[in-house]
Amino acid sequence: MSAEKLYIEKELSWLSFNERVLQEAADKTVPLIERIRFLGIFSNNLDEFYKVRFADVKRRILINQERGGSDNSKRLLSKMQAKALKLNEQFDELYSELIREMARRRIFLVNEHQLDEAQEKWITKYFRKEVMPHITPLLMKDEIDVLQFLKDEYAYIAVELRKEDHSQYALIEIPTDHLPRFVMVPEQKGKRRKTIILLDNIIRYCLDELFKGFFDYDELAGYAMKMTRDAEYDLRNEIEYSLLEQMSAGVNQRLTAMPVRFVYEREMPQEMLDFLCSKLRISNYDNLIPGGRYHNFKDFIAFPNVGREYLENKPMPPMKCADFEGYANSFEAIKAKDILLYYPYHTFDHIGELVRQASFDPKVLSIKINIYRVAKDSRLMNSLIDAVHNGKNVTVVVELQARFDEEANIEWSKVLTEAGVHVIFGAPGLKIHSKLLMISRREGDDIIRYAHIGTGNFHEKTARIYTDFSLLTADQEITNEVRNVFGYIENPYRPVKFNHLMVSPRNSRTQIYRLIDNEIANAKAGKKAGLTIKVNNLVDKGIVTRLYAASNAGVKINMIIRGMCALVPGIEGVSENIRIISIVDRFLEHPRVVITHNDGDPQVYISSADWMTRNIDHRIEVAAPVRDPRLKQRIIDITNIHFTDTVKARLIDKEMSNSYVPRGNRKKVRSQVAIYDYLKNIEKQTRRQKSDVSDT
């Protein structure tokens, strides 16, 4: 069978994932405002797709043209464009449907032509007081390099000022850095209706306010537009510049990078479109996408609560983990037994509290942590600064190349360094994506180490919407190896061996192959064999080939893949023993988990790494075995609950059809809700057991 039929192109698979996001916006069982927010998530995802994946394929085409290579990338780009345009059409239809549905609920998202007299007066007053001070039109004269001034991923209104048969053009940036995109328009007392207008439409209504007295025109019209730039940048790798300086320069390259997408309002006159393409140096019409009158739909992620609870998801407040209760501090709790947290079902506050306690605990000697993405106003980061002030030795490994978080991480690096934190940036050429924390504490004559190994970032905000595991342990074999990982980050050329952890790029590939090969050997020996895998992305061809071999040997493989999946399940003689589902629901599924049957003695690993070549071979990633039988079973149970989902699970197949898992005569199970109930029950049982012990 040809390689083309054995591997799905990752870019097309990614678009298929975003189609699943769009399915949530189309799902009438999802509360109305959540459906609108899913449109925002879809749009945000698509923006990133063009900045990264689309731009990457375009670069490959240029390289192939220079080298005289094949045109496979051209064919792929054509498929990507066709799929993206089809999804955009579905998006536009859905948006119109949701606007009508909101109107039926007495919620009106109005444009500048739908205002009554009282609203017009209020809008004009709001514009003059709040909006106009933040607007300076950019006149597109011949000598102005518009491309230099246009910001990536910002929404603009292109304005035509027409006098008889002559037109002038100007650009207005919609100032969402200073003002809300959605503005609630006051209603008359007693009216139950809610009226919302976009900032874009306030500006459109008041265009005359901006230009009158300065320009002579007969007609004035505005059209929405947005440009997406290539997100790639080159590091100078010059010895006289620090990595921090190189990264700052690299991020600045994005400000002037070439456009990879130009989205414009369909009603824009052709003459104006041609003028803009000329000014933006867009010659390839593959980059042009006609759209509606609103761009930067990602802002719809924050669509306002209109005061009607039934239009949003029912609250699922994060719960406290009972394993911490009954102890003087977090260290005693972790030392008593390993603790597993699962966000957002558990509160991330436990991690913030652990670091806060470490920052002033007189027994704590040092704290080491590696940061990939972190909240802007992170309590955890401030605790690290407090720790330095309290005389602790604090080391923070900051990944400066965390995509789209580079600027935030550069800023945090400066703040931490100024506070006296030892900030390091890791190994050249190896992005650090592991989620490690190690606290060393003097207890009597011993130094005891406490470690956190996670699947997600130390990010208070994303921990409310991403599902992720955190393992907290004082197991000496594990914590010693975590210590060695930090040593490896600081000195990647020093020989180091890991017997328990999987650490990319040292041993992850060989260990993953070993786990798969063990199941193959068991299957061939007539023993029960199985693999359960949960990752965000599976695109590494070496691992895919190994999984095909396992399927051929009779190993039953169940997978949950949220995003890109290159493996094609259900091919006779190749992958008929492989079943893949994807869950898209209110929380973003983010953990990486590997469970092997191991002839009845399951092995369970949690990991920071997706099964992509970059994560296995070109990044520092860490997977840890879960040794406590209670916690192993908990992860197995949680994973199994996903496979019972009859509401939000989609089948991954070679057609990328995104069909829902057939329910048949099974009961309705929405796995994220079922997992919340499962963990709530565990916390109740734990508290009951602790209460019984204290009563005896």
UniProtKB/Swiss-Prot annotation:
Record NCBIfam families: poly_P_kin, PRK05443.1-1
Class of the enzyme per the UniProt entry, highest EC level: transferase
Lineage: Bacteria, Pseudomonadati, Pseudomonadota, Gammaproteobacteria, Vibrionales
Keyword Magnesium: yes
UniProt similarity note: Belongs to the polyphosphate kinase 1 (PPK1) family.
Family matches, as PROSITE patterns: PLD (PS50035)
Binding positions (Mg(2+)): 373, 403
Binding site for ATP: 45, 466, 562, 590
GO process annotations (BP): polyphosphate biosynthetic process
EC numbers: 2.7.4.1
Name assigned to this protein: Polyphosphate kinase
Purpose of the protein: Catalyzes the reversible transfer of the terminal phosphate of ATP to form a long-chain polyphosphate (polyP).
Source organism of the structure: Vibrio parahaemolyticus serotype O3:K6 (strain RIMD 2210633)
Post-translational modification: An intermediate of this reaction is the autophosphorylated ppk in which a phosphate is covalently linked to a histidine residue through a N-P bond.
One GO CC term, this protein: polyphosphate kinase complex
Reactions catalysed: [phosphate](n) + ATP = [phosphate](n+1) + ADP
Record-linked Pfam families: PP_kinase, PP_kinase_C, PP_kinase_C_1, PP_kinase_N
SUPFAM superfamilies, per database record: Phospholipase D/nuclease, PHP14-like, PPK N-terminal domain-like
Keywords of the record: ATP-binding, Kinase, Magnesium, Metal-binding, Nucleotide-binding, Phosphoprotein, Transferase
Co-factor(s): Mg(2+)
CDD domains the record matches: PLDc_EcPPK1_C1_like, PLDc_EcPPK1_C2_like
GO molecular function: ATP binding; metal ion binding; polyphosphate kinase activity
HAMAP family per UniProt: Polyphosphate_kinase
Span of domain PLD phosphodiesterase: 428-462
